[in-house]
Amino acid sequence: MKPDAANYDPRPEYLAELIGSTGLSQPALGRLLGVTDKSIRNWLSGRNPFPYTVQFALECLVLSV
């Protein structure tokens, strides 16, 4: 799987789906990604956009790539 920002889906609902697919808690996911719980909450609420790099990392994790 190669990164392609053209596949970026900025919807918080998509992020929530990816997070749910990992089976990880938000704190565990934050530690894995090197971000705070607050960042994840802000992304999920739509307050702040999440970066494509986060989407790609989660997609790789879900697909076990």
Residue ranges and their predicted role:
Residues M1-S21:
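A short, Lys/Arg-rich alpha-helix, primarily the initiator
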